[in-house]
């Protein structure tokens, strides 16, 4: 049976729900799919199907995340929802789900809570550019308490502005009532999606830059060859393109003989899309997760760089003790983790949990690196820091 061709007639946006535990993120995600399914723009996903999230790995960190897709009349959305707070932190620091914008869900009965604040801060640190607020559980507020909602809104706006998110639209509604089909609340979901359409700009896709895709997984398809999957970070890849495989081992060249997305064949894949690429003459053992596929000579692998790093505090799940020059944690770049040896700058004897520092790293295997790229630092199964490459040395 020939595969159906994927229709690309709308711009594609990656978004996600963020916010405090039990404020209604997953219920809202389900309510969005329900409201849009009535217009034939989504398949309805109920709460339990979103809540029973499969485990996935990003930079070697196990994350539970649910991905749903839906459309508005103008756009195609991929939406990520995480069940647990720790999953959000890991998802955002690792950039596992790069978000073009986020829907911050806040319960009108509670207002901003600790994780609300933490998620806003995280969004800022990892570069989520836009936020739209959904003030949930508005059906629980009595007439007498109506003005409390205005106070919650003011507090939220201040909190967001403090972190550089000015003028975020705030939509009031009830995800649960919308999910139950209450027409006035379903209308609020439509209003929310209109606000998302209007306030989260279609990102400048990195389509014009040289093609690059970090490999997430490798499959062997009998009779066809080796398929590598991942999210295209930038550029365009077409069937017939010459590409390089960079990182971990010696750089190799190959030809892309097929591109597919959601099990449908495409003539090309573009930045932001999750695709599978069929590679000519490459065996399953020639490629592995953590390498990148790119336009020839656009990226090189490196082993030495300077990083601007934030080391998590003990309370954030980080280390309890300082570390010194010679420290050897794991460094996570895109889809790979490599041990690296840390050299602290002159005059810095040690780094304490909670410190911001710039230090040098010598990796034990070559990785495709670029300045401005993000990474996570892990040790003994937990994230102890996150950073950005400030300078490549070798």
UniProtKB/Swiss-Prot annotation:
Residues given in the record as Mg(2+) binding sites: 26
EC number, as in UniProt: 3.6.5.3
Any Gene Ontology CC annotation: cytosol
Residues annotated as domain tr-type G: 10-204
Gene that encodes it: tuf
Protein name, UniProt field: Elongation factor Tu
Compartment(s): Cytoplasm
Signal peptide: none
Transmembrane portions of the chain: none
Species whose genome carries this gene: Chlamydia caviae (strain ATCC VR-813 / DSM 19441 / 03DC25 / GPIC) (Chlamydophila caviae)
NCBIfam families: EF-Tu, PRK00049.1, PRK12735.1, PRK12736.1, small_GTP
A molecular-function term among this protein's GO annotations: GTP binding
Region spans: G4: 136-139
Keyword terms of this UniProt record: Cytoplasm, Elongation factor, GTP-binding, Hydrolase, Magnesium, Metal-binding, Nucleotide-binding, Protein biosynthesis
Main location class: cytoplasm
UniProt record similarity statement: Belongs to the TRAFAC class translation factor GTPase superfamily. Classic translation factor GTPase family. EF-Tu/EF-1A subfamily.
């Amino acid at each position: 049976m020939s595969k159906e061709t994927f229709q690309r007639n709308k711009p594609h946006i990656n978004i996600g729900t963020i916010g405090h535990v039990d404020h209604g993120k997953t219920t809202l995600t389900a309510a969005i799919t329900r409201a849009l399914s009535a217009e034939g723009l989504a398949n309805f996903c109920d709460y339990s199907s979103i809540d029973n999230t499969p485990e996935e790995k990003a930079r070697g960190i196990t994350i539970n995340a649910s991905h749903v897709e839906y459309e508005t009349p103008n756009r195609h959305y991929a939406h990520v929802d995480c069940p647990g707070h720790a999953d959000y932190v890991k998802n955002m620091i690792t950039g596992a789900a790069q978000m073009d914008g986020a829907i911050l869900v806040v319960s009108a009965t509670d207002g901003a809570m600790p994780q609300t604040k933490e998620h806003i801060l995280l969004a800022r640190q990892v570069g989520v550019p836009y936020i739209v607020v959904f003030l949930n559980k508005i059906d629980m507020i009595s007439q007498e308490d109506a003005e409390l909602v205005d106070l919650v809104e003011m507090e939220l706006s201040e909190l967001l502005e403090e972190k550089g998110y000015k003028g975020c639209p705030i939509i009031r509604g009830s995800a649960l009532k919308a999910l139950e089909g209450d027409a006035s609340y379903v209308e609020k979901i439509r209003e929310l999606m209109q606000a998302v359409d209007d306030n989260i700009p279609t990102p400048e896709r990195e389509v014009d830059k040289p093609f690059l895709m970090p490999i997430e997984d490798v499959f062997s398809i009998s009779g066809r060859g080796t398929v590598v999957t991942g999210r295209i970070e930038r550029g365009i890849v077409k069937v017939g393109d010459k590409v390089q495989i960079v990182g971990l081992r010696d750089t190799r060249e190959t030809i892309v003989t097929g591109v597919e997305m959601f099990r449908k064949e495409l003539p090309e894949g573009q930045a932001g899309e999750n695709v599978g690429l069929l590679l000519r003459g490459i065996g399953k053992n020639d490629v592995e997760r953590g390498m990148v596929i790119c336009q020839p000579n656009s990226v090189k692998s490196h082993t030495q760089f300077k990083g601007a790093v934030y080391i998590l505090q003990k309370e954030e799940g980080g280390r309890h003790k300082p570390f010194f020059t010679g420290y050897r944690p794991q460094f996570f770049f895109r889809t790979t983790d490599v041990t690296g040896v840390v050299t602290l700058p002159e005059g810095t004897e040690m780094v304490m949990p909670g410190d911001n520092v710039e230090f040098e790293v010598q990796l034990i295997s070559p990785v495709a690196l670029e300045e401005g790229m993000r990474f996570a630092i892990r040790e003994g199964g937990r994230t102890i820091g996150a950073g950005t490459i400030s300078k490549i040395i070798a």
